[in-house]
C-alpha cells in the first residue's frame, strides 16, 4: 500500500490494474485461492509481502508429517490439541475415566498449573489446559498446550502404562523446539536453528494421531532428516503415515 501511495504521489500512471488479495486460509490449504483461480482471472504477476523489512535472501525447508500410534488404555479416553500444523498449540483437552481418588489427584495437579477439570455426566472427567501459541518458525517464548497436558497427566500418576508411555513420548519429542526430541538438532550460519512443533494431535478410538511441522535449515539434507525422524518415531511406538516437503532455497 505504501509503495502504491508513493507511486501515485510521484505522478506514476500504471498501464495495468492492481488487485489486493486478503487470504483467510493460508495455514489450512489455501482453498480460498483455489476458489478464486476457478472463478476469476488470475493476475499476470504477484508480490507476496511475507517477510520482515528490508529483504529476504532465503527460506528454510518446510517438512510436515503425520504419525500414528495405537494406545491401549482404560484410563485415557481422548486427548486433543491444536488447530493448525504450523502453530504451537494454545489449548489441549483430555477425557479420562478414573476413580474418585484418581480424579482428585488429577484436579490437584492440573488446577495448580492453571488448568481446569469438569466432571461429566457419564462419570468421566474432562481436563482443559492452556499454553502460549507461536508460529512454528518462531517458537521462542511459547508453551505447547499438548506438552503441558502430557506432563501434567503423567505427573498425576493416574494413567495406566501405555497412556503414560504416550505422555512420555510427547514430552520427549516436543519438549524442545529445536529438533533434539526428533534427533535432528541441526543449524547453520545461513539460516540458524531448525525448529519443530507438534502442531495438532488427536486420540480417538484407540489410535493417537500426531501432526508435526518442521522448518529446517538450508544446509540440512532431507534424507537424513527422514531417517532420523523415522527411527525416533519407531522408538516411541509411532509409524510415519504421510509426509510433505518443500525444499529450502538460499
Task: Report residues per predicted region.
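Acidic/histidine-rich catalytic neighborhood of metal-dependent amide-processing enzymes
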Residues: 1-72, 101, 107, 111, ...
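Metal-dependent amide/peptide-bond hydrolase catalytic core
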Residues: 64, 70-250
Amino acid at each position: 500500500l505504501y509503495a502504491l501511495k508513493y507511486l501515485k504521489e510521484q505522478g506514476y500512471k500504471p498501464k495495468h490494474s492492481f488487485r489486493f488479495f486478503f487470504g483467510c486460509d493460508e495455514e489450512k490449504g489455501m482453498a480460498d485461492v483455489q476458489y478464486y483461480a476457478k472463478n476469476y482471472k488470475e493476475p499476470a504477476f504477484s508480490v507476496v509481502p511475507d517477510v520482515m523489512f528490508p529483504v529476504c535472501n532465503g527460506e528454510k525447508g518446510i517438512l510436515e508429517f503425520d504419525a500414528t500410534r495405537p494406545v491401549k488404555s482404560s484410563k485415557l479416553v481422548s486427548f486433543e490439541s491444536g488447530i493448525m500444523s504450523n502453530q504451537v498449540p494454545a489449548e489441549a483437552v483430555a477425557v479420562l475415566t478414573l476413580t474418585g481418588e484418581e480424579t482428585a489427584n488429577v484436579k490437584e495437579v492440573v488446577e495448580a498449573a492453571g488448568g481446569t477439570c469438569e466432571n461429566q455426566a457419564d462419570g468421566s472427567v474432562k481436563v482443559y489446559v492452556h499454553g502460549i501459541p507461536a508460529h512454528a518458525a518462531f517458537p521462542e517464548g511459547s508453551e505447547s498446550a499438548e506438552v503441558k497436558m502430557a506432563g501434567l497427566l503423567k505427573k498425576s500418576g493416574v494413567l495406566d502404562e501405555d497412556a503414560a508411555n504416550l505422555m512420555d513420548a510427547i514430552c520427549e519429542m516436543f519438549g524442545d523446539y529445536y529438533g533434539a526430541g526428533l534427533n535432528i538438532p541441526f543449524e547453520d550460519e545461513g539460516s540458524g536453528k531448525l525448529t519443530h512443533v507438534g502442531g495438532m494431535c488427536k486420540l480417538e478410538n484407540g489410535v493417537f494421531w500426531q501432526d508435526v511441522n518442521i522448518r529446517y535449515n538450508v544446509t540440512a539434507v532431507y534424507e537424513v532428516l527422514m531417517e532420523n525422524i523415522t527411527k525416533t518415531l519407531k522408538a516411541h511406538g509411532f509409524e510415519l503415515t504421510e509426509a510433505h516437503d518443500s525444499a529450502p532455497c538460499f
